Amino acid sequence: MELCFNEMTVMKNGALPEDIALCAQAGFSAVELRKGTLLRYLRGGGTLEALRQTLEEQHVRAASLNALESVSFQTKAGGRMLRELSEWCFAACRVLGCDCMEVIASFHVPEGTSATAICRETADSLLRLSDAAADYGVRLALEFMAVPGSSVRTFAQCAEILDTVDRANVGMLLDTWHFCAGGSRPEELSALRGDRLFMVHVSDCPARAPFTAQRAESYWPGEGDAPLEELLRSVRATGYDGPCSVEVMDPNVLALPAGDAIRRAAETMKPLLARVER
């Protein structure tokens, strides 16, 4: 599997194109670009073409652009804004040589909406985005999130939505923190095809009852209680051989200088992947 770094981990102190050089120095071959950081770079006078050149010079590929948020249960005006933003993001992906975009379902669902209705609405929204993304050669990776308000909270729910969509360019983003925090188990992955899994985020999680962990309790691999080695072995058994991207939301980590955080991410992730791939 591919060693990848997620810019969310340095969202406070990171910057482009500097993060890319730091990732290369630490041994990462891929990076997930954060939309907000990318926009800040462009507003400061940078260009997509120059950023792609930096990626190529540093031998780091853009594995994903993150994220399109609240893609479901949109108002008419919100839907129009989402279409405009998604078209820009997909076009940016093409320039950057990036073939994947993270998508997140809505956190604002009408009270009393059934699980079946959430599945159908989310699937319909993904189908519309899928058509637009396909024109740019972009895949959509739906992330389930085991946090309050999320309309897609579990691995099983996400898998059901993907079965409903059934498109080659729509798959899953599996975050080990959300997987464990939502009470999912490694054996559940046996039903998942590797080609349905587009991205894996890795961070550690404390032992908590399902849906009670706080997002700030997202730690470096090996500093929590999640069975990360077992979980990543189960991921690998599906046939997945793509990016394993370090994303840590601990406020102490977010406060670190970008270089320190990127080096620490490599130090904790490299041994874990080595054990998984023995």
Outline where the language-model segments fall.
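Histidine-acidic metal/acid-base catalytic patches
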Residues: M1-C4, T9-S29, R52, G97, ...
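Short glycine-enriched, charge-decorated loop/helix-capping segments at active-site entrances
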Residues: R40, A77-G79, T116-A117, R215-P221
